[in-house]
Amino acid sequence: PMGSPVAYLHLDLLTKLVHDLRDTKTRLFVIIGAASLKLPDGQRLLDQLLAMPDHDQWIGVPLNQTYEYEFLQMIDNVDWVAVSPSRNFGPGPTNGYVMGTDQVMVDAKGKSELSNGNMALAILDEIEAPKHRRQRFTVRNQEVDE
């Protein structure tokens, strides 16, 4: 659950994986949440989430996934890549995706959505033809007319 008192285990696992993979050729692929993405005003999505009422009941995972990204940015001896989904992530069609870097992406209708099928497609594309080394990228659903 998002408010889990053991949300810190996300970061614990990542630090162990980084330790084990230091100075190896094995690529570390990390799926982190959208909370560390930036909004148009320059704030992180996390800042907006922290301002919501009763956030303490569910903020543990988004907060710790932001810590994961901050930690990864300090790592220069592991071949890592991280991916953040759009704000709304869940079931849906696999019809293509649009890739970005550190900003919350929205379509022409202002929606920030990503289906699990399009997330899988983006991950497989990155594994088969790497474009990001020690970087994070984000993806959103491609609109039908894009």
Describe each region flagged by the PLM:
Residues K16-T24:
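Glycosyltransferases and closely related glycan-assembly transferases
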Residues M2-A7, T24-L28, A34-E146:
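Oxidoreductase cofactor-interface core, primarily capturing Rossmann-like NAD(P)-dependent enzymes
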Residues L9-K16:
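Charged helix-capping and loop-helix junction motifs
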